[in-house]
C-alpha cells in the first residue's frame, strides 16, 4: 500500500502544546509516541490506557487540519509499533489502537477551541470556576488564556457568557449535533480528495471554464429578423360574390365589372 503523504504543516502547528497531560503509564507512551508523530507530520491528541478485556493503549492522532484518514492510522501504526517495542513503556502485553479523535472529539489545544467556535461543547473543570465544575454551551472562541462559552441554562439574572481558564480545564469535548456531523464529513471528504490527488490516484480538479470576452458579452444582441406578415387573403364568399353568381346564372351582366 502506498504511504499517505500529508501536506507539510507549519512547524508551529505541530509544536503547539496540549493543555492536557496524561499521568502514569500514558505519560510514558506519550514521551515515545509524540516525537514519532511529529516527524510524520501528525499531532498527538490523547493517549488512553485501559484494562478492559486485557490492556489496550489507544492513541488519538490527527493532521494539523484536524482530519485523520484510515490510511493515516495504518501508517502511524506501522511506524510507531517497532519504536514502542524497543522503548517498552509498559511491563505487560497490550493491544495498540491508533484512531482519529472522532466527531465528538476532545479539545486539547488552544487552536481547537478557536477552530470549533460555534459548536456545542461540554467542559469539566479540574479546578472549579465560580463554584461549578461542569459547563455545557455554545463555544464562542478564545479570549486571552480563557475559553468563551455561552452557557446553557443560565437564568435571566445570570450572564450566559463565561470565561473558563484554559489551564484549569480537565476535559473538554464537542457534543454531537447535526451541524457538527455535516462539518466533519465535509472536512473528511476534502482531506480524502487531497490525499488521492497527492498520490496521483485522482485527477486534479478541472480548470475554470474559459471566461467570455467582456466586449462581446456586453455587446447588444440583435434579435432575429422579423418575418413578413403573410398577406391576408381576399374574402371569397361575400355578399357581392353571391349576387354576381346569381346574375351569372340568370345571364345578366354585372354593370360594376370593369370599373
UniProtKB/Swiss-Prot annotation:
Report the protein's function. Answer: Required for maturation of 30S ribosomal subunits.
Name the UniProt record assigns to this protein: Ribosome maturation factor RimP
Keyword Cytoplasm assigned: yes
Kindly state which keywords UniProt assigns to this record, in alphabetical order.
Cytoplasm, Ribosome biogenesis
Q: Name one GO cellular component term.
A: cytosol
State the Gene Ontology BP annotations: ribosomal small subunit assembly; translation
Chief localisation class: cytoplasm
Region described as Disordered:
198-259
Q: Which organism is it from?
A: Rhodopseudomonas palustris (strain ATCC BAA-98 / CGA009)
Family recorded in the similarity comment: Belongs to the RimP family.
Q: Where is the composition biased (Basic and acidic residues)?
A: 243-253
- What compartments host this protein? Cytoplasm
Going by the entry's taxonomy, the superkingdom of the source organism is recorded as Bacteria
Q: Which gene encodes it?
A: rimP
The UniProt entry, under CDD domains, shows: YlxS_C (cd01734)
Amino acid at each position: 500500500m502506498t504511504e499517505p503523504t500529508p501536506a507539510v504543516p507549519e512547524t508551529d502547528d505541530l509544536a503547539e502544546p496540549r493543555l492536557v497531560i496524561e499521568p502514569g503509564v500514558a505519560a510514558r507512551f506519550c514521551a515515545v509516541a509524540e516525537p514519532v508523530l511529529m516527524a510524520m507530520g501528525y499531532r498527538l491528541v490523547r493517549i488512553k490506557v485501559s484494562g478492559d478485556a486485557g490492556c489496550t493503549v489507544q492513541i488519538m492522532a490527527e493532521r494539523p487540519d484536524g482530519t485523520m484518514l484510515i490510511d493515516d492510522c495504518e501508517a502511524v501504526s506501522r511506524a510507531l509499533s517497532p519504536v514502542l517495542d524497543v522503548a517498552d513503556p509498559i511491563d505487560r502485553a497490550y493491544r495498540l489502537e491508533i484512531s482519529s479523535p472522532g466527531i465528538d472529539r476532545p479539545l486539547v489545544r488552544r487552536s481547537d477551541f478557536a477552530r470549533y467556535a460555534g459548536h456545542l461543547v461540554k467542559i469539566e473543570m479540574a479546578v472549579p470556576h465560580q463554584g461549578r465544575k461542569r459547563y455545557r454551551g455554545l463555544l464562542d472562541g478564545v479570549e486571552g488564556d480563557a475559553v468563551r462559552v455561552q452557557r446553557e441554562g443560565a437564568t435571566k439574572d445570570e450572564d450566559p457568557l463565561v470565561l473558563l481558564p484554559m489551564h484549569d480545564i480537565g476535559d473538554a469535548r464537542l457534543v454531537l449535533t447535526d451541524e457538527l456531523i455535516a462539518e466533519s464529513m465535509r472536512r473528511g471528504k476534502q482531506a480524502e480528495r487531497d490525499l488521492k490527488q497527492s498520490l496521483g490516484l485522482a485527477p486534479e480538479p478541472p480548470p475554470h471554464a474559459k471566461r467570455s470576452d467582456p466586449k462581446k458579452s456586453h455587446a447588444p444582441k440583435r434579435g432575429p429578423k422579423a418575418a413578413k406578415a403573410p398577406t391576408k387573403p381576399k374574402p371569397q364568399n361575400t355578399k357581392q360574390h353571391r349576387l354576381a353568381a346569381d346574375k351569372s346564372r340568370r345571364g345578366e351582366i354585372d354593370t360594376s365589372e370593369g370599373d
